[in-house]
Amino acid sequence: MEKKPFVTKEQLDEIVKKYPTPFHLYDEKGIRENAEAVKEAFAWNPGFREYFAVKATPNPFILNILKEYDCGCDCSSLTELMLADSQGFDGQHIMFSSNDTPAEEFAFADELGAIINLDDFTHIDFLEQTIGHIPETISCRYNPGGVFKMSNGIMDNPGDAKYGFTHEQIIEGFKILKEKGAKYFGIHAFLASNTVTNEYYPKLARQLFELVVELRDKTGCDIKFINLSGGVGIPYRPDQTPNDIRVIGEGVREAFEEILVPAGLGDISIYSEMGRFMLGPYGCLVTKAIHEKHTYKEYIGVDACAANLMRPAIYGAYHHITVMGKENEPCDHKYDVTGSLCENCDKFAIDRMLPKIDMGDLLVIHDTGA
């Protein structure tokens, strides 16, 4: 797909007169259209809710936009809980999914009435000791171990991840939680990151749906929801094809009808936590070229740095770059696009073919919304 900015050079020229670079810019129209598309894709499930991953974009204005579409908040820290609370999210609209969790964070989540999603078997006793009870509604994060594979070769390694209960632990955990007073249960799993395929959610759903039937049969627990978490990705590179949320939703529905409905579990709600999919393409980092350097390589220095966008510096992530006003010019110059931090990893692009960049040019770094 061709990567085009959602803003024109003329619009940016006006914006920078008021807001100096660098800054993040968001496409409200795109955010709203995407949120509506997600709702429509899962409208077959009456209890569906997207719990937006606050860590992806901890911005109160954006949280309030998503709240208009009945989104909740997926929180993993005290700060995120405080932000969700400050914007009027409460009770069942907050999912607290944390790991290595401090006692005060469990206590605050319980105070807000959030759904607590336990990451570890030992957290059952820790939670009870911390807040003095087990909530009536509780969730557990599942990790099946091994390697998670899909037909297109995309894979991840849950067995090497620090998160979640094992298969044996989640069965035993549900039994213990029920004995301690829990009445309503949920499960959660995140098995692969940024999957650019419509196959991931339906395959994950089948695995979790089968587990839920087993949990119901072996524990007698009343399972109210299944949280498919995140992992639905976006096309950072121009040669990638975007996911189709309608196809994804239909794939999950088919698995639901095949597995849960015949088992008498057709009233279970489906939840998601698609932070990247909800916001990634609808934000960009706008920065200005302020220096050029000609040594062993050609460098363009911009006024943004890794503090504004960490993904490239942390793990070499690709973010497409558009030189505004030069979209139709040939990409015949090879540059490293760098920030000013005293770390050599502070680079937004390495050996990137771009049009000739002049000082003062505005650069749009794509897909920074999450």
Where are these regions (language model features)?
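General beta-strand structural signal in soluble alpha/beta enzymes
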Residues: 52, 73-76, 96, 117-120, ...
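A charged N-terminal "starter" segment
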Residues: 1-136, 175-183, 214-217, 222, ...
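Short, glycine-/Ser/Thr-/acidic-enriched flexible segments
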Residues: 30, 57, 80, 101, ...
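Glycine-rich, aromatic-flanked loop segments that form ligand/cofactor-binding clefts
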Residues: 133-147
